[in-house]
Structure formats: C-alpha cells, structure tokens
C-alpha cells in the first residue's frame, strides 16, 4: 500500500482566498532590446517568488495565445491581480530595488547559425552575465536612459559551489576584449567570447542546468550557462562545425564531471536534433523550451501534492472484451511548446473529452512548474489520457546513460511517475539517416539498445512502453526485453497523413483488420493543433479526429467492434490479456528496505525524500548538517510496510550540503542533499 506524507507549502494569499499581486509587462510592439531586458529582469525577480509575468515577449510558436491564456488562468484560477505596465522605464522602476545596474553590449553585433536566424550575440552574453549579478543587458544609451550604472568589472558570487567571488567584465562591448578584435569575422568573434565564457563564466553557473539557443527568463532565473549554437541542417550531425561542437563538448564534459552520479538537464533547442542522443552520453536529459515565462510558472507556488489523472483505470474493474482497442496519441509531449502551449491550443477545443486521446507530457517540466500541472489535471476529463514522452525526465534516452548516473535516473524517474500518476511511456529514436553512425566517438542509432532500455523500463516499473522503432515487430505486444513494449512502424501511424480524413480512416481500418480480437492498435501518433489552426499534413484537430473515429466505426466489417481508449485503458487491457496483471498494483509490498536519493537535488527550497519498508518498522528519518548536528526530524513513529514520501522544506536554512538519515529496525542509510539558494 502506498502512503504519502506531505509537508504542505502554500501561499498564504491562496490559502485564505486573498489576492496575489504581480506585475505584468505587456511587450506587444516592443523592440527586441527591450524584450531582452524584460526577460532578464523577470529571470532575476522571479527566482524566489512569481513577481513579473511577460505578455508577448517570447511566446510559443505553436500557439500564439499562450501568454494571454495563462494570464487569464492566473487571474481566475490562481487569484492573481496583475499591475500592467507597457513602458520599460516604469517596469524598471517597479523592481529597481532588485537591480544593481547594467551590463553593456554592442547592439550592432549579430550572428546567425543557419538561414532565418539572427541574434545579438553580445546582448545574450550580457544578459547571462547580468543574471549572475542582478544587472540588466543594455546599450550605453539605454544605461543612461534607464539610469542603470555601468562598471568596467562586476563581482559575481558563486551561488552553487561556495567558491570565492570572481570579477568579470561589466562591458561586453569593451573594444579591448579579444572578441572585439575587428580583424576577426563575426563567427570567430562570437566563438571567442563563448570560449572565454567556458573558462570564466561556466564555473559560476548552475552545475545541473545548461541552456542552448536564444536566452530566456528561465535561463536567467536558474543561472544557467548559455550558448546559441546550431548546425546548418536539422538532421545532419556534421552540419555542426567542429569549433562549435568543441565548445559544446567542453561544456558537457564539465557538467558531466560536476554531476558524475546524477542526471543534469539541458534546455532550449538543438539543431541538428540527433545531437540529443549525443548529449545523453554525458548523462543529460533534454527539454525544448523556446519560450518565455517559465521563471514565473516555476515560482508560482501551489500546495505540494501528488496528482492522479481522471483517466486512471482501476485494473479490477475492467476486462478485455472481444473488441479492437485503438488509441490516438498526441506528439510533442516532451516539448514545452506543447506542455506550456496547451497542446498547441487543442486543450481548449470544445470537442476535447468527446473521444479518448493520449496527451503526451514532460513530467520534469510539470515538476518544475506545478501550477501548470495542477491546471491540466483539474481540467482534464476521463477521456484525456496522460502519458510521458519520451521519458519522465524529458527528451531522453535511458539506454545511453552510463551506469554511474543510472540509479539517480531511476530514482528521479520513479518519483516523477509517482507524483504525476503516469506509468505509461512513449519513446522513439528516428533521426539517424543511415540507421547508425558515429559522432565524436559516440554511436547514434535509429533504434534503442532494447536490452538496456528494457532493463531501465523494468527498474522504473513502467507498465507499458509504446515506441516507434524500425527494428521491432509492429502493433503486437513485446515481452522479451524484461518490460512490456508495443511498437508501431511502417503502417502510416507515426505522423501519418491526415489531410484526407477518409483516407486516414481507411488506412486505420486496414490496420485494424490485421488484428485478432481482442486486438490492440496505435492508430495515430499525431500533432494536435487548435481547432482553427492552419494545419500541416500530419496535424489533426479534435473535430477532425471525431470525424475519423466516426468513419472507422461506420465500417461494416470491424466498425461495431472498435473501441477508442486512453493509454491507461490500453495498457491495463493489454496486460490483462497477457496475464501480466492479476492483482491490485497498489497493494504490492516492497521486497526490501530503501532510502532513495531526494528529488530534486540540488534543491531550493523543497525536496522530496522517498523510502520503503518491507515490514512494519519503527522509523526515524532526520536531517543533519555537514557537522552531524540534527536540523529537523521528519519522521519518528511506527509505520506499516509500504512506500512513503516526505517533503523537506529548507526555506529557513542556509545553502549547503545536508545529510538525510533513516533508521528502520536494523536498516540504516544516509544520503547527501545539496541546498542551493
């Protein structure tokens, strides 16, 4: 039996139904320099509380009403009262107490990695440096206009390693800097600055998070090291120049060293996309986050809770019938553009809930931004199935992680699955053109290492792993790799054409007829869009999906036996058919004692500690400082056999390493936890 112990953290204003006040900056019509300043400001002031919301500063490309919708939801659902501002000088004045001055840059320094991109490289680095010392990126003229003093050098305090403060440039545009050597071309100048940053700025930045591409408020708030590097092609790994790849590898190697026994996270985007596999070899997980306001979403605190989708299925209440069970899955679930962007607006369809759908989510982003999770869980219906894409830890490849980080990856994955009530996963690899290639000493493949992948899925207790892989049989259950897998490939169900709905329905009907009852079919892995969107050939809307379902059910041969289900129902029925599910899953007793690594770690200010008992025991769970002095006792009582979780709130403690120790009968274990403020 699973039991949860919570220490609740709740805004007093929300607890008593009072209004929560924040500032809204309306960036509609603002220039790129003003927007960069506003994003940097938001990143600085939103670190410990949600103070500044950005409207139309850096909105999701997938749904252009994302900022407006979340603004309205915060007003009605979060009881937020926004003080709206559109003039930058007024915005700065509202938060001047938080700002130490400016970091100057040359606004005429542009660079592009590929056709269609163009960014101010000095400005982005000024924003990153400014975020580390609470200063805003400005030109010399802006510094005068907004009364933001400049300094030749600024002192940066290391928030993560307790190292001595370091002086760095306060003027990125200083002509004496090597990256301002006018004899160099623009790329050489930018890469010179990045290489300087790797040596001087990276050690001062967040050792567990890294950002690639255009800088955002999230980058600043988390004090990440940032680079804006990409290849010229979306898929060709060799389109990334050697000099750029060298910089990335130097950063990844450093982060791997700092996180030798745990996963670190990369945010932003990478082109070519197969580099996400290369990143995984260094022990990372990736997250597409090309959008603003994550600093606000992550800092808007809600009651610490565990979530159960309304689509959750009690295995004891259902049995497979003489039917064909089919599912439609929403793609892009790992990407913030879909997680934050309301599934590209499809979440607001009046037809959502009329037919079962499997919505993909990034559980790591949910954990970082629990208000978002709470909204989706509260507004979901029984027909809104939830699954994790491509891993609960994000856009990740568990089969590529080394043994050193595996236990942490398993522990954090199980925590995320447990917190969000999601135990079905969709994974894929499909970006190595030749099927397999070697890139900088690492093997990039179109297929998983099924033995390693299956071992990981078993370790996290994934109930069903759906995947797209060219090497596995299609549309049949696979149990030969220690975990239940179900693949779909080569039948038009992966980003299949949805332009002609009759043709789409006929394609699915043809695939259904290949099944024997009770049969199971992934009918479509499609990109869902808002109802009135201008859609591409692989996109679908809820009204169009309903038309497809009606066409399938109208088929005179199989139509009457087709049932569209959620991933949760699909998983339970398949396991019932295979004899893999015979007892209540939530009554399983652990086979041994365990104290798992806390998550998140490092943390600020809360972290969750999980432990398990195979028999009833007297449990003492305490927190100690590095000298062994007890800080607090979280548990001190008899507990029955089961799995437990407790939240440790360190908001009143100083940054540093703390020890968690459990004593349960003869079982004693400790873990180290890092509080970083």
Regions found by a protein language model. Give the residues of each.
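Sec-dependent N-terminal signal peptides
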Residues: 2-13
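Preference for solvent-exposed, low-hydrophobicity sequence contexts
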Residues: 18-304
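Catalytic grooves of carbohydrate-active enzymes
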Residues: 250-261, 266-267, 326, 331-354, ...
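Active-site beta->alpha N-cap acidic-glycine motif
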Residues: 294-377
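Substrate-binding cleft of extracellular glycoside hydrolase catalytic domains
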Residues: 360-423
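Glycine-centered coil/turn sites that cap beta-strands in beta-rich domains
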Residues: 581-599, 603-623, 645-650, 664
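C-terminal tail/sorting-segment detector
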Residues: 633, 637, 647, 651-677
